[in-house]
Swiss-Prot record:
Its EC number is 2.1.1.-, 2.1.1.218, 2.1.1.221. Residues 133-171 form a coiled coil. The gene is Trmt10c. This is tRNA methyltransferase 10 homolog C. It is an enzyme of class 2 (transferase). Component of mitochondrial ribonuclease P, a complex composed of TRMT10C/MRPP1, HSD17B10/MRPP2 and PRORP/MRPP3. Interacts with HSD17B10/MRPP2; forming the MRPP1-MRPP2 subcomplex of the mitochondrial ribonuclease P complex. Interacts with GRSF1. It comes from Mus musculus (Mouse). GO terms for biological process: mitochondrial RNA 5'-end processing; mitochondrial tRNA 3'-end processing; mitochondrial tRNA 5'-end processing; mitochondrial tRNA methylation; mitochondrial tRNA processing; mRNA processing; positive regulation of mitochondrial translation.
Length: 414
């Protein structure tokens, strides 16, 4: 008994906080157990004369051990908390599925993390309903695709049965162009555009103004715009400016393009357009601009804001252009079209198709065919009286351009 009391005496100072703080007993008990297992003396019984004095407790070592254990326990608690929240979210989804609510059958880790970030229960239900609708649309599209493929195969088999052996052995003077050859030719045009083509900038600095669904819609329009530009006769040199690494835009683009992202024939940079080009050669295209675009300028650099705005936040791109002290222009929609309903904001793929047509032809009527017909009722028709007035003005201007007493003036008076 004497040996036991003598052994516990050095730890009396450590046992006092243990008795007062019962809530953290698991932490201090683990620390004491670790420290006692490493520092405790042997309990062998000796004679009173040969008994050595007990070892003194090293407070500095005990404090260091306790701090390290607190840090380890904190990290483990954070990881356990994340795992518990993921597990609870999966259980919640499974419970809602059993209750018959609109919940997707398969959900990715990224969608699961986005679901965990939802603040309220109603927000989680809305996001799960959105994923459910997206999954159903994907399945319906896949079924329709399979049905079309089966119909094509049946039509092909029927056509082969109807054709004779002589018709099957026909020779043609034209070589067949395979997809690989077409892609190589389009790639060469893209390389030439990067070296000598006119730049066209997509401003990617609007990811904070959009919801996740709006950002995904914007990236879809960017993919379609890049495809239209790549297949054009004289493509632009596309710039993705203000594209931050690991931003929402960058993650979504890499997710869509996958391994082709590093092979795209375009320039993606974190710099602003004013850092790459002189300000006097930049024109920011925005529907809120008071300046109407009259002709396409081949020596200018046009900027399009990558911004899908369903909440009608008007003036966002115009305010940014004013802050950067950049010239702005808008398309002459009211001059050529009988505008019916809706705002004058166009999608990114519609804008690039209009600009490509203007660049190649310079004809506004041909370029504005890409404006959706649901927004206007047709082109403005100039009346005969207006045409007669224009002709008179042209004649008057031509008459005044000659000197007095010239032959042309006398002939005109006669």
């Amino acid at each position: 008994m004497n040996v036991t009391v003598r052994f516990l005496r050095p730890f009396a100072r450590c046992l006092v906080p243990y008795t007062f703080h019962r809530k953290r007993s698991h932490l201090y008990s683990g620390v004491l157990q670790r420290y006692m297992s490493s520092k405790a003396p042997s309990l062998s019984c000796h004679n009173k004369d040969s008994a050595s004095p007990p070892e003194q407790l090293e407070l500095d070592g005990w404090k260091a051990t306790m701090k390290s254990s607190i840090q380890e326990d904190g990290v483990s608690e954070v990881s356990d908390k994340d795992e518990d929240s993921l597990a609870s979210t999966r259980e919640l989804i499974e419970m809602w599925r059993l209750l018959g609510k609109e919940v997707p059958e398969h959900i990715t880790e990224e969608d699961l993390k986005t679901l965990m970030e939802c603040a309220s229960k109603s927000a989680k239900k809305k996001y799960l309903r959105y994923l459910y609708g997206k999954e159903k649309a994907k399945k319906a599209k896949q079924v329709k695709k399979e049905m079309k493929a089966e119909a094509r195969e049946e039509a092909k088999r029927a056509r082969l049965l109807e054709t004779t052996a002589e018709e099957q052995q026909q020779d043609f003077m034209f070589l067949r162009l395979w997809d690989r050859q077409i892609n190589i030719a389009l790639g060469w045009k893209g390389v030439q555009a990067m070296q000598f083509g006119q730049p066209l900038v997509f401003d990617m600095a609007y990811d904070n103004y959009m919801k996740p669904s709006e950002l995904q819609n914007t990236v879809s329009q960017l993919l379609e715009s890049e495809g239209w530009n790549r297949r054009n006769v004289d493509p632009f040199h596309i710039y993705f400016c203000n594209l931050k690494i690991d931003s929402a835009y960058h993650r979504e683009l890499v997710k869509r393009y996958r391994e082709k992202w590093d092979k795209l024939l375009l320039t993606a940079t974190e710099k602003s357009p004013v850092d790459l080009f002189p300000k006097d050669s930049i024109i920011y295209l925005t529907a809120d601009s008071p300046n109407v675009m009259t002709t396409f300028k081949h020596d200018k650099i046009y900027i399009i804001g990558s911004f899908v705005d369903k909440n009608t936040q008007t003036g966002t791109s115009l305010a940014k252009a004013k802050r950067l002290n950049i010239a702005t222009e808008c398309l002459p929609l009211d001059k050529y079209l009988q505008w019916e309903i809706g705002n004058k904001n166009l999608t990114l793929d519609q804008m690039i198709r209009i600009l490509l047509c203007l660049k190649n032809t310079g004809n506004w009527e041909e370029a504005l065919k890409f404006v959706p017909r649901r927004k206007h009722t047709g082109y403005l028709e100039v009346s005969e009286q207006s045409q007669e007035l224009v002709r008179k003005l042209k004649k008057t201007k031509t008459l005044n351009s000659f000197r007095k007493g010239s032959l042309n003036v006398r002939t005109w008076k006669r």
